[in-house]
From Swiss-Prot:
CDD domains, alphabetized: MPP_PPP_family
PANTHER family, A to Z: SERINE/THREONINE PROTEIN PHOSPHATASE, SERINE_THREONINE-PROTEIN PHOSPHATASE
Gene Ontology MF annotations: protein serine/threonine phosphatase activity
Protein's organism: Caenorhabditis elegans
SUPFAM superfamilies: Metallo-dependent phosphatases
Name under which the protein is recorded: Uncharacterized protein F44B9.9
SMART domains in the record: PP2Ac (SM00156)
Length: 254
């Protein structure tokens, strides 16, 4: 783990804060784009995701890595629980500064002062209750914060916002991803072998120019990348013209 001087960190923060101030709360981006879920301080896995080579590139040509050419959306939770939170946040902030139009960095609950203070260096996992059938939203008594939601709530939210798919993070999934509510909601979790204790895969979602969705799975310890092409029903296809993302993910149910 490298060390950072106070001057380096303050300079990095000042530069990225100025960029964030200039951006709208509701960010819009056109595909193709890669969506990354929770990282939680797992720096090596973050680097591995960013260093994937462009799929269309000739094997004999000079490697062109995705971190400098692709568009990325991060759903938050870059820090806490892992051992290299500082490295992770410094890397994504540096990429935002170098490629401001290619990176959208959303704020997860672990990017709030209270949560960061509480979980910064502790190992903690929480098992939530099963999602109920009724009512659509109820208080999450198991975790003591936020709410639980069901399929009816997802359908109503999509109808009100006129959207076809909600992509969220904030929850470990054994396969790295999971669809819900007839594929109108997908949870993405990008930290394989979470906290070096759970035998889960990591995943990222890729949205092609035509709106087609694929999921890249990263396993641990061999870190083999495997592509699953998910054929979405026509009414579940993403609008390929633009994607809208909230910069304050804490307003979403989790």
């Amino acid at each position: 783990m490298r060390t950072y001087s106070k001057t380096e960190l303050f300079c990095l923060l000042d530069m990225v804060i100025e960029l964030f101030k200039k951006e709208k709360t509701l960010a819009e981006i056109s595909p193709p784009v890669t969506i990354v879920g929770d990282i939680h301080g797992q720096f090596e896995d973050l680097v591995r995701l960013l260093n994937t080579r462009n799929s269309s590139e000739n094997a004999k040509s000079k490697p062109i890595y995705g971190f400098s050419t692709k568009k990325w959306v991060f759903l938050g939770d870059y820090v806490d629980r892992g051992y290299k939170s500082l490295d992770c946040i410094c890397l994504v902030f540096s990429l935002k500064i170098c490629f401001p139009k290619q990176y959208i960095l959303l704020r997860g609950n672990h990017e709030t002062r209270a949560i960061n203070f509480r979980y910064g260096f502790r190992v903690c996992s929480v098992v939530v209750l099963k999602i109920p059938a009724k009512p659509s939203f109820i208080r999450n008594n198991k975790r003591g914060l936020s709410v639980c939601f069901n399929e009816a709530a997802v359908n109503e939210t999509c109808r009100l916002l006129n959207i076809s798919l909600i992509v969220r993070g904030h929850q470990m999934m054994p396969a790295g991803f999971k669809f819900f509510a007839d594929r109108k909601l997908c949870t993405i979790f990008s930290a394989p072998r979470y906290m070096n204790e759970i035998d889960n895969s990591g995943a990222v979602m890729k949205v092609a120019s035509n709106g087609k969705i694929s999921i890249s799975i990263m396993k641990n310890p061999n870190f083999a990348m495997k592509m699953f092409l998910l054929q979405m029903k026509s009414h579940n296809s993403l609008d390929h013209r633009n994607m809208r993302l909230s910069k304050n993910s804490n307003n979403l149910p989790s």
